[in-house]
Amino acid sequence: MKRLVFTLLLLASLPALAQNAVLHVYNCNDYIAPETVERFEKQCACKVKQSYFSDNEELLAKLAAGAKGYDVLVPTSNYVQGMAKAGWLQPVDKSKVPNLKNIMPAYLDTPFDPGNKFSVPYAYTITMIGYNDQKIKELGLTIDSWSAIFDPRILEKLKNRVTVLDSQSELMAAALKYLGYSVNDRDPKHWQEAKQVILKAKPYWAAFKASGYIEQLAAGNIWLVHGYSNDIYQADLGAQEAKQKFRVRHAMPKEGAVLALDAMVIHKSAPRADLAHQFINFMLDGQNSADLTNMIGSGNPNTAAMQHIKPEIKAMSAIFPDEQTAKKLEMLKDLNSKERRLMNRIWTEIKAK
């Protein structure tokens, strides 16, 4: 009788156990290949439920408001230090992530997370310029500098056909680079200079866009964008699929640009930290890591992925820059509270005018 009761209780608990076998991932949209998710679900006998944020500022705001229920988060690395200090993350148990050995040394042990205590590299993007090659040729322009985004003399020819990222950190970084400063310059006077550069260029821009510029660039409605390398790659694919007469090209500004290394971290109150570790290790497998690059054209810090990446993508210098170009790339560093308040104030002034 006791055995029967135990069996009945066990059977009754199975639906609850199955219901709990859910990994909650908070990520950017379209930042993991669907087939990769399917493979993981099959391997772990679980479900992956994804929620999406448009940028790191939205992610931070949600966590600051007390959001819970997430297992894996995918922020940009320079935000990891602040997230850890805020108590939002738990350390990664590296004994459960043996595939960490696949990550190139250049992307490990960053100043944002020494020893990779809280984060594991996922993918990277480079913020650059994308453009409609047909329209740019017709206008007689050469796109090799941030002047294409900020110089009114050039923008006059592109009026209302340019979009810029709706990101205070990215747009200010581009303006600082244009002025000859580091993207991590902290001099308030230089920030004011960058603000003035942006305000002078703003009347010529069509919009600030965090998303949607891929489709507009592919459709030919927008001719030039300040955007991410993987988005520009996808816009070119879209233009080709639509059989457009133009191609969407990448342009690496000669002044340099931002390289954003995105990372996987585990939320402090993750309901399924065990699944989170399984997922992180799974994503560091060469084939699984390559799936993302092959789908969206993201940069890849995984040595084991290289043999699985499409040759035409691997050959693109905008996605896998050469050594000389790489020297001009910088990772953004997080701001302290005083700097963030000033940056927020400058951004409010930019958006209001």
Q: Where does each model-flagged region fall?
A:
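Early extracytoplasmic/lumenal segment of secretory-pathway proteins
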Residues: 19-83
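Extracytoplasmic ligand-binding site segments that recognize negatively charged/polar headgroups
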Residues: 76, 80, 84-204, 209-218
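Conserved C-terminal helix/tail region of periplasmic/extracytoplasmic solute-binding proteins
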Residues: 215, 323-353
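N-terminal signal peptide c-region/cleavage motif recognized by signal peptidases
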Residues: 13-15
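A bilobed periplasmic-binding-protein/Venus flytrap-type ligand-binding module shared by bacterial periplasmic
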Residues: 130-135, 177-180, 260-272, 291
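Periplasmic-binding protein-like
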Residues: 102, 191-200, 206, 244-265
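A ligand-binding cleft/hinge motif common to bilobed small-molecule-binding domains
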Residues: 79-82, 224-245
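Mature extracytoplasmic/periplasmic domains
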Residues: 267-328
